[in-house]
Amino acid sequence: MTDKIDYTKKPLTLAEQVARLKQRGLVFDDESEATAYLFNISYYRLRAYTYPFQENGEDSEHTFTRKDIHFKDIIDLYCFDRRLRSLIFNTIEKIEVAVRTKIVQVYAESTGDSHWFNDESLYRFGYDDLMDRIDADVNRSNEDFIKHYNSKYDNPSMPPSWMALEVVSFATLSRLFQSLRLDSRKEYITEQFGLKKVAILENWLHSISNLRNCCAHHSRVWNRRFMVSVILPYNTLYPFMDRTTIGQIRTNKLFAVLSCIAYILDIISPGSDFKKNIKELLKSDCRLLDLKDMGFPGNLSPFAGKIANFVFIQSDQQIVNLSVPVILDSSSYRVCYFNC
């Protein structure tokens, strides 16, 4: 292991930040405008958007690898990513609410227990850690219904499931579902999201939760490699993707997670504008945008401005827009996402 050293870099003025970027090869059309952007967005945040276009070796000067990149191009890419994050974040809310509702309803109804989530026998692992997470999330909440419960009741100390699980984070909710023992209730919830295997839904919720957190904390998502790779199933209750399509997808990139989100939305929110809005966003005239950076299959990249539909089912005879889930013979149809 390399020995650690002292951090000796000094802060830069805004003018010095512009000069640094110019020295490295970034083109500025209006330095005063660029200075204003840097004062609002920050040099360090924009670094995530310049990094892919710079030499970044250990002893590198971080020179731009292309001589035609303007500061405006970096801002355009940043703004595209910001709009993308906003769209994704607002969309995930629907999935998050649906997951909360189904878990609470199914387990509360089947157990007849308002506080079923406290029952250790329901879990296969991680009970103590999960209870600590739920307790922390509930105690952190400022919701009036939590305050009302705490002011009126002293036993149980935790509010009922429909209150407590309403305020826990999506990450905690995902962890709860993963920790629950495999039984018919868990399988039933999985089927409500169009999936046949519980492990797939567990993976999807984990992946979507991670993406949600990136959006919530204003982290870039456009070219991110996610820590959790998405499992893309060959066999689902409704049309998804065929084996050939799945084999072309990088499962740790954004495209894979968006495909899962789109599939779930077609089930829980038919007629959602998500696919339409993604299609419009991908028409961006951002010069640095390359769909391959988002994990799109490479042959789609040249058509960034010509996306016809987010999801379609293609056969030899016809193309059918998929606005609601339908069961089709998978032998005669091929399901693709973001195709042209």
Where are each of the predicted segments found?
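Acidic, Ala/Val/Gly-enriched low-complexity intrinsically disordered segments
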Residues: 316, 320, 324-329, 335
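Long, contiguous internal "core" modules enriched in hydrophobic/ aromatic residues
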Residues: 2-316
